[in-house]
A protein has these predicted regions:
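Glycine-rich Rossmann-fold phosphate-binding loop(s) that bind the pyrophosphate
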Residues: 3-5
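FAD-site-proximal beta/loop scaffold in flavoenzymes
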Residues: 90-142
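Conserved mixed alpha/beta catalytic, RNA-binding, or beta-rich assembly cores of soluble enzyme
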Residues: 112-114, 151, 168-171, 214-215, ...
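A conserved FAD-binding loop/helix module that cradles the flavin
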Residues: 135-180, 262-264
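Surface beta-strand/loop "capping" patches
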Residues: 167-208
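Short, aromatic- and glycine-rich surface loops/edge beta-strands on solvent-exposed regions
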Residues: 201, 212-216, 242-264
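Aromatic sugar-binding surface patches on proteins
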Residues: 233-243
């Protein structure tokens, strides 16, 4: 199996339960892109080896797969020729990432974020086109359904308000940018009005970190939030809640960053 995201990990277990011998799960990154519990329950419990910083460089066989050639990769993810070895197998399963399905969003001309692959939304989940709302995996890929449900409630609440003509005029509009250590952050913009309720920010770390500090800053360097995290992983969504009034008082756009504490 090439790829160690949650679907690849779960498929490893499913294949084992169906009677297959899963020879290995290969991951090009130096860390797994799946939840820790899935690594334990889907690989460790079934004695399936996980090769980090490895990828397939060739698939062998003519009419049928007979094996794969695997190599370790360097820090720039380039295969190292002197590390190549073979794994005999008759099936290769590719689990190489999810992309939100956004044919409708593109047809409507919505602004699409280049990293999430979904529409750019504000804290109410309203897209770049007034009156059109989006939530869940169409906005960005989630690892937990709890956050999908939460986003759906937000989008439904404000879509209903919009339909009833109860929207408040935005006093300020600003962008939310991922800074150092952050790969993506949703919402990507904020439409703020007086009495703005709490704002939830959802983000993914750019790399695994232990004892990291999450910082939200205004353009002038004013710190709106500083929170310590025991661990941050690209595979696990980070969610923080902030008082909407804090953004009204900030200067300019907002940047969200993660910094790992120095290790001993």
């Amino acid at each position: 199996i090439l790829g160690s995201g949650d679907i690849g990990l779960i498929m490893a277990r499913r294949m084992a339960l169906e009677g297959c011998k899963v020879e290995a799960v290969l991951e090009i990154c130096p860390y797994s892109n799946g939840l820790t519990r899935n690594i334990v329950q889907c690989l460790n419990d079934y004695d399936i080896p996980l090769y980090l910083s490895h990828t397939i460089v060739a698939i062998e066989g003519r009419d049928r797969v007979t094996g794969v050639r695997v190599a370790k990769v360097d820090e720039r993810m380039r295969p190292l020729p002197d590390t190549v070895f073979s794994i005999p197998c008759d099936t290769v399963l590719l689990s190489v990432g999810l992309i939100p399905e956004n044919e409708l969003s593109c047809a409507l001309g919505l602004e699409i974020h280049p990293k999430t692959g979904g529409p750019v939304v504000d804290q109410h989940r309203e897209t770049s086109q007034a009156g059109i709302f989006a939530a869940g995996n169409v906005v960005h890929v989630h690892d937990l359904v709890d956050f999908v449900s939460e986003e759906a409630e937000i989008a439904g609440k404000y879509a209903a308000r919009c339909a009833r003509g109860e929207e408040s005029a935005a006093r300020r509009s600003l962008r939310v940018w991922p800074g150092d250590g952050v790969n993506t952050c949703v919402p990507q913009r904020l439409s703020l009005s007086e009495g703005e309720a709490s704002v939830r920010l959802f983000m993914r770390a750019a790399r695994p970190m232990r004892r990291a500090t999450l910082t939200v800053k205004g353009a002038g360097g004013d710190v709106l939030l500083s929170k310590r995290l025991a661990v941050a992983k690209p595979s696990e969504m980070i969610a923080v809640e902030m008082d909407g009034a804090r953004f009204l008082d900030s200067t300019g756009d907002v940047t969200v960053s993660l910094e790992e504490e120095a290790r001993d």
